């Protein structure tokens, strides 16, 4: 009715201008105060707020998808710098630990999300391709679908909204499993008497090796021969004095 009599879209009251320009808004007495009940700062959204941490309005940056669990208890000290959402939104609550760990939660009024474990299971790329060697023991989900005949022929007019399956014959990167290569078995080589004699002589020479005589041992502490370093009585700096 008021639009028929006279349009007031071009009229702006002083109160609306004061709210938009934040006239009369006093800065906070100290930074880090709880501003969860305050409005969003319009100047910060335009990168034009000069009050910084003393601004009485909320500074929201980026897309925050999870509610801050410390803010729910009134214990979050980060304020606007918190990377989580300071807003009670049931769709953005963190996942319930007890339901995800044990499959049940005794709290009838649990504020956290109860996500069905089956919804977390990913589809098996091998089964979607046509065959999975793990069968029912596969840790991924095997979903039975009816293949679209038009897509197999070459073109489906329904596109992504088709109720039948459009198979994808390529596998995602990082999920391909290559079967182990068969080990190349070599026939055992026959040892001739000459080879056996050489091996026996090598084993006997290796077994006959013992500690070297003291005349060939040089002490690295004093530089003299005739004893090991752990038996040296002249100290570890004896080679500097030339003793």
From Swiss-Prot:
SMART domains: ZnF_C2HC (SM00343), ZnF_C3H1 (SM00356)
Gene Ontology molecular functions: RNA binding; zinc ion binding
Compartment list: Nucleus
Region (Disordered): 174-193
Zinc finger (CCHC-type): 217-234
Amino acid composition bias (Low complexity), ranges on this chain: 175-193
GO biological process, one term: mRNA processing
Pfam families: zf-CCCH, zf-CCCH_3, zf-CCHC
Matches recorded under InterPro entries: CPSF4/Yth1 (IPR045348), Znf-CCCH_3 (IPR041686), Znf_CCCH (IPR000571), Znf_CCCH_sf (IPR036855), Znf_CCHC (IPR001878), Znf_CCHC_sf (IPR036875)
Zinc finger (C3H1-type): 35-61, 62-89, 90-117, 118-142, 143-169
Positions carrying Phosphoserine: 241
Function description: Component of the cleavage and polyadenylation specificity factor (CPSF) complex that play a key role in pre-mRNA 3'-end formation, recognizing the AAUAAA signal sequence and interacting with poly(A) polymerase and other factors to bring about cleavage and poly(A) addition. CPSF4 binds RNA polymers with a preference for poly(U).
Family: Belongs to the CPSF4/YTH1 family.
Protein name: Cleavage and polyadenylation specificity factor subunit 4
Organism: Bos taurus
Lineage summary: Eukaryota, Metazoa, Chordata, Craniata, Vertebrata
């Amino acid at each position: 009715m008021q639009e028929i009599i006279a349009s007031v879209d071009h009229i702006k009251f002083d109160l609306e201008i004061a709210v938009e320009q934040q006239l009369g808004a006093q800065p906070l007495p100290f930074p880090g105060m709880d501003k969860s009940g305050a409005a969003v700062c319009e100047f910060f959204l335009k990168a034009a707020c000069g009050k910084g941490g003393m601004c009485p309005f909320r500074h929201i940056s980026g897309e925050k998808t999870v509610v801050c669990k410390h803010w729910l208890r009134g214990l979050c000290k980060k304020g606007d710098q918190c990377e989580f959402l300071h807003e009670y939104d049931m769709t953005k609550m963190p996942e319930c630990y007890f339901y995800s760990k044990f499959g049940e939660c005794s709290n009838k009024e649990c504020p956290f999300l109860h996500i069905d474990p089956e919804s977390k299971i990913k589809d098996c790329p091998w089964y979607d391709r046509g065959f999975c060697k793990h069968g029912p023991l596969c840790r991924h989900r095997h979903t039975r679908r009816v293949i679209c005949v038009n897509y197999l022929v070459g073109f489906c007019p329904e596109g992504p909204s088709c109720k039948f399956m459009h198979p994808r014959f390529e596998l995602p990167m990082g999920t391909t499993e290559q079967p182990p290569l068969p080990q190349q078995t070599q026939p055992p080589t026959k040892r001739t008497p000459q080879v056996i004699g050489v091996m026996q002589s090598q084993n006997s020479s290796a077994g006959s090796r013992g500690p070297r005589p003291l005349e060939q041992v040089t002490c690295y502490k004093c530089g003299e021969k005739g004893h090991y370093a752990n038996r040296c009585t002249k100290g570890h700096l004896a080679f500097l004095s030339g003793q």
